[in-house]
C-alpha cells in the first residue's frame, strides 16, 4: 500500500511522536494505533476506562498517600504542552511537577500559529519574548481561502497561522524556564492512577517510585487521556475531524511564499468520506519544503473511512492541489496524521475534586485551526489565572472546578 510505504520511508527523517493531534504522529505503528482508536470510537462500547481516578476517604497523609514533604500545588500530567502551563504557574509562585510518560521533548514538525497567539505565552510568563523569537522559524504572508467551483476570487488575509514554530525549541525553552523557577520534571513516568483524598490527590507513577501528592491535578494528556475516557465512558463523539498530511521537499520555490488556510479542490467525496479540505504552509527546513494537510469532518458511524484509507486519497489528490505532476516529484520528509473528536458538552466537566482537564483533554480545540498548541495558547491566560485563583482560595472541589 502506498500509504504504508510512504510512512515507513519517512521514519528515517522524523522521530515518531506520541501526541495525538494534527501532525502528532509519523510512524507506521502509530498509524495502526490511531486507526485502532478510531475504530473503537466508531464501534462504541469499547473505549472507556474504569477506575483510573478514584475517590478515597480521609486525608492523604494519614493513608499512606505519599510523603507530605514532597507535596506540590499542581501536578501537570502530559508534559509536551503541559509544560507551557506549568512554566507559567511555577513562575507565579505555585509548586508544580510535570509528569510525562516519555521524554519531554518537542517533535520535529512545525506548529503553525500567529505571532499574536505566541505572544500569549510571554504574557502568561511561560517564556520571554526572546524565547518566542528563537522558537519562530519562519513567517509568511498572505494567507488564502478558496473553494472548488467558486466563481469568486480567493479570500486573502494576513497574520493568521502565519508563523512556523519549532516544537523542539518551544518545549525546551519553556522547560528551562520552568526548572529555573524551581519546577520538577518527571520523565518516563508511568502514571497508573489518581486517588483523590480530602486534602490532596495522590498520583501513582509506577513501581519503584514514590507517589506524588498535589493539591490539584491538571490533565493535559489529550483526548486519549485515561481520565477523560473514564468520564466520557463508551460514548461516541458527536463529531470528528480526521487529518492526514506530509512535509515534503521539492515544491516550486516561487509558489512557496504564501499559505492556504482552507481550500477545496474536489466536490464532496463518496463512501462517507465527506468534504476534503486542505491547508498548506511553507516550512523552515528549506525554500522548497512545504507542509500540506487534508482533513474532513464527519460523525463516528461505523461506515466512516479509516485514517489509512484517507492517506491513500491524500497521495492521489495532493499533486492536483499543489499543481505538481505526481507525488513522486517531491521527497517526503514526514508523514502526518491525527484526529480530533468533538462533543456537544465541551469543555469537559470534571467528575472529581482536585482534577481538571485542560487543552485537548477538555475538548476546547477548534477543528478548523486544529488543536494542540493553538487551542492551548488561546486559553492559557484564562487557565493560569483561574488555577491561580482556585489555589489561593482553596476552591478545588468538583463544583468549584466546574465553574
Regions found by a protein language model. Give the residues of each.
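Conserved acidic residues
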Residues: 72-73, 215, 353
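N-terminal FAD cofactor-binding segment of flavoenzymes
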Residues: 103-147
Amino acid at each position: 500500500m502506498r500509504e504504508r510505504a510512504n510512512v515507513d520511508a519517512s521514519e528515517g527523517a522524523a522521530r515518531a511522536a506520541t501526541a495525538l493531534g494534527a501532525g502528532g504522529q509519523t510512524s507506521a505503528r502509530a498509524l495502526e494505533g490511531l486507526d485502532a482508536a478510531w475504530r473503537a470510537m466508531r464501534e462504541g462500547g469499547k473505549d472507556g476506562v474504569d477506575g483510573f481516578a478514584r475517590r478515597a476517604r480521609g486525608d492523604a497523609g494519614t493513608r499512606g498517600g505519599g510523603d507530605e514533604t514532597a507535596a506540590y500545588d499542581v501536578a501537570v500530567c502530559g508534559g509536551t504542552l503541559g509544560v507551557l502551563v506549568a512554566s507559567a504557574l511555577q513562575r507565579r509562585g505555585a509548586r508544580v511537577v510535570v509528569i510525562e510518560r516519555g521524554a519531554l521533548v518537542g517533535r520535529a514538525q512545525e506548529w503553525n500559529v500567529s505571532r499574536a497567539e505566541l505572544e500569549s505565552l510571554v504574557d502568561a510568563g511561560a517564556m520571554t519574548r526572546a524565547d518566542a523569537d528563537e522558537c519562530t522559524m519562519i513567517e509568511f504572508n498572505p494567507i488564502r481561502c478558496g473553494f472548488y467551483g467558486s466563481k469568486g476570487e480567493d479570500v486573502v488575509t494576513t497574520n493568521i497561522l502565519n508563523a512556523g514554530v519549532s516544537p523542539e525549541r518551544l518545549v525546551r525553552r519553556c522547560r528551562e524556564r520552568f526548572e529555573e523557577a524551581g519546577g520538577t520534571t518527571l520523565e518516563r513516568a508511568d502514571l497508573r492512577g489518581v486517588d483523590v483524598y480530602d486534602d490532596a490527590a495522590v498520583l501513582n507513577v509506577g513501581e519503584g517510585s514514590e507517589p506524588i501528592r498535589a493539591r490539584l491535578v491538571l490533565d493535559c494528556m489529550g483526548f486519549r487521556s485515561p481520565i477523560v475516557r473514564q468520564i466520557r465512558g463508551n460514548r461516541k463523539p458527536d463529531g470528528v475531524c480526521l487529518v492526514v498530511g506530509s512535509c515534503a521537499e521539492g515544491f516550486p520555490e516561487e509558489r512557496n511564499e504564501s499559505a492556504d488556510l482552507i481550500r477545496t479542490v474536489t466536490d464532496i467525496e463518496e463512501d462517507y468520506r465527506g468534504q476534503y479540505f486542505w491547508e498548506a504552509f511553507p516550512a523552515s527546513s528549506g525554500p522548497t519544503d512545504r507542509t500540506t494537510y487534508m482533513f474532513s469532518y464527519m460523525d463516528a458511524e461505523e461506515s466512516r473511512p479509516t485514517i489509512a484509507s484517507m492517506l491513500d486519497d491524500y497521495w492521489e489528490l495532493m499533486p492536483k492541489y499543489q499543481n505538481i505532476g505526481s507525488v513522486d516529484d517531491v521527497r517526503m520528509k514526514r508523514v502526518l496524521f491525527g484526529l480530533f473528536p468533538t462533543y456537544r458538552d465541551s469543555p469537559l466537566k470534571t467528575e472529581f475534586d482536585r482534577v481538571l482537564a485542560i487543552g485537548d483533554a477538555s475538548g476546547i480545540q477548534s477543528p478548523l485551526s486544529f488543536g494542540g498548541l493553538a487551542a492551548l495558547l488561546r486559553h492559557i491566560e484564562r487557565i493560569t489565572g483561574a488555577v491561580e485563583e482556585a489555589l489561593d482560595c482553596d476552591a478545588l472541589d468538583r463544583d468549584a472546578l466546574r465553574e
